[in-house]
Regions:
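A membrane-topology feature that recognizes alpha-helical transmembrane segments
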Residues: 1-178
Length: 178
């Protein structure tokens, strides 16, 4: 346990790195250069760690989202300096969209999800819109499957963590559409 009461993410981080390494050959096929591959792999590490943590604890640590945001901006500045302003803009826009959603319906969307969305915006820029659309589509399909399996009344009581869907949507965007 860490001082903030959250479990240490070491095991999840190692698993996330393994998943990112396994996905790297697929990313390499879709990435035009190392300048795209390294940030994509770093993003996947952050996203899969967040997804596993969210599934296990229903929380996304500030350390993870804060470090993820800094790493994404630093990698952009290093490899694609002309895109830093765009990435910061989309990090802000996606953050604002998710924050508005969290404020409209308190308890429906956690602030960890809001901050994780900013990491996605910083990493993907304009393609973050596609990633979020994929994430919500996948989440809607899973929600519909739960509703079919449990019945609508019981399905409404099920709270799904969003980070796994954000990770899946971003991975699909990296592999096929971003």
């Amino acid at each position: 346990m860490l001082s903030d009461g959250q479990p240490a993410p070491g095991r999840r981080g190692a698993l996330s790195a393994a998943v990112a390494a396994a996905v790297a050959p697929l990313l390499a096929r879709s990435a035009a250069s190392t300048a795209q591959l390294l940030p994509a792999a770093a993003l996947l590490c952050v996203l899969f760690t967040a997804a596993l943590t969210d599934l296990e604890t229903r929380r996304i640590p500030n350390r993870l989202t804060g470090a993820g945001l800094l790493v994404m901006i630093a990698l952009t500045a290093l490899f694609e300096p002309n895109f830093v302003a765009e990435r910061l803009l989309f990090a802000s826009l996606v953050f604002a969209f998710f924050l508005a959603a969290a404020l409209v319906r308190p308890g429906g969307l956690g602030l960890g999800d809001v901050k994780l969305a900013a990491v996605i915006g910083a990493a993907l820029g304009a393609a973050s819109v596609i990633a979020v659309a994929f994430a919500f589509s996948i989440g809607a399909l899973v929600g519909a499957a739960i509703a079919l399996a449990r019945g609508w009344r019981h399905a409404r009581a099920v709270a799904l963590p969003l980070a796994p869907f954000l990770a899946a949507g971003s991975a699909l965007t990296l592999l096929f559409g971003g």
